[in-house]
Design a protein with these regions (language model features):
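N-terminal anchoring/stem segment of glycosyltransferases
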Residues: 1-77, 230-232, 247-254
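A structural signal for short, well-ordered beta-strand segments and their strand-loop junctions
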Residues: 5, 44-47, 81-84, 105-107, ...
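Short catalytic/ligand-binding loop motif for oxyanion handling, primarily in non-cytosolic enzymes
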Residues: 14-15, 52-55, 89-92, 97-98, ...
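Short, charged/polar micro-motifs that form catalytic or ligand-binding hotspots
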Residues: 20-23, 57, 134, 140, ...
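Short amphipathic alpha-helical segments and helix-helix/interface helices
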Residues: 30-34, 67, 93-97, 184-185
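GT-A fold catalytic core of metal-dependent nucleotide-sugar glycosyltransferases
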Residues: 59-121, 145-146, 150-151
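Catalytic core and acceptor-binding pocket of nucleotide-sugar-dependent glycosyltransferases
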Residues: 65, 136-239
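Short, flexible, basic/aromatic active-site loop/helix in glycosyltransferases
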Residues: 121-135, 152
Length: 254
């Protein structure tokens, strides 16, 4: 059985964050992961269709059906990386599947701690009995490695959503504090999931805030997986497209 890289590239054909133009950079992500998988004897799976209307369940929540999706497509697997399509992987990225110790793995979200803490406080107050989790253990759900022992946990995530769907949809619109990410972090802690943190090099998020995303492409010498999120003044995701295209061409076409 092979290890699987699972990502999503779904045309929501809407406006704003649902606009089709938001998908334009994803081809560079998918191409980079395709080449990394070929080099490391893994298989890439790209989900291109919604399972449920986005009004019923935000697209980010739908990835927690991935075990059912792979099973429905007769795909056998050992371990699975669930990764966002706004990432580029370095061609020489080490095989992180060999680093997991068969645990769930992710990377601490070294982004805006103001946003993270506000999100923790709000979701903790309304969904987790006022509990505040340790923000230093908060991960970005755009990079999570799992295996079949985590199937039940993913079902618990879906069950949590279904039990709280109406309120979750409401707070997603009103708080602007994320969708699945903070609740899933709480659930990882609440369910006692045996977890292993990988270093920042394996999910380099919020690179603009760290002043490492630049035309010299220096960041590609200091890490392995780059996530192009939280880019200021990113109208119609044009800067995401610019940087992902530039990074892909720098790494794969020079």
């Amino acid at each position: 059985m092979k290890n699987i890289v699972f990502t999503m590239d779904i045309d929501l054909a809407g406006e704003g964050r649902y606009a089709s133009t938001r998908r334009l950079p994803y081809e560079y992500s998918i191409n980079s992961w395709e080449r990394w998988c070929e080099k490391n004897d893994c298989e890439l799976f790209v989900l291109t269709d919604l399972l449920l209307p986005k009004e019923q369940m935000n697209i980010c929540w739908q990835r927690y059906y991935l075990f059912d999706i792979l099973e429905a497509n007769d795909i056998q697997y050992d371990q699975i990386l669930s990764v966002d399509a706004d990432t580029i992987v370095h061609p020489d990225c080490p095989n992180f599947f060999e680093m997991t110790d068969r645990k769930m793995c992710g990377v601490h979200n070294e982004g805006s701690y103001d946003w993270i803490i506000r999100s923790i406080e709000n979701y903790g107050k309304y969904f987790f009995n006022g509990h505040n989790m340790d923000f230093t253990k908060y991960i970005d759900c755009g990079f999570v490695i799992i295996n079949d022992t985590h199937r039940d946990f993913f079902k618990q995530v879906i069950d949590f959503y279904n039990e709280n769907a109406e309120m979750l949809r409401q707070v997603e619109k009103e708080w602007h504090a994320g969708t699945d990410q903070t609740p899933v972090n709480f659930l990882i802690e609440d369910k006692g999931v045996d977890f292993k943190w990988l270093p920042y090099e394996f999910n380099m998020c919020d690179m603009v805030r760290k002043e490492i995303l630049g035309d010299d492409m220096m960041f590609t010498d200091w890490g392995w997986i780059y996530q192009y999120n939280s880019i200021p003044n990113n109208k119609e995701d044009r800067l995401t497209l610019h940087w992902m295209k530039k990074t892909y061409e720098h790494l794969y076409e020079n």
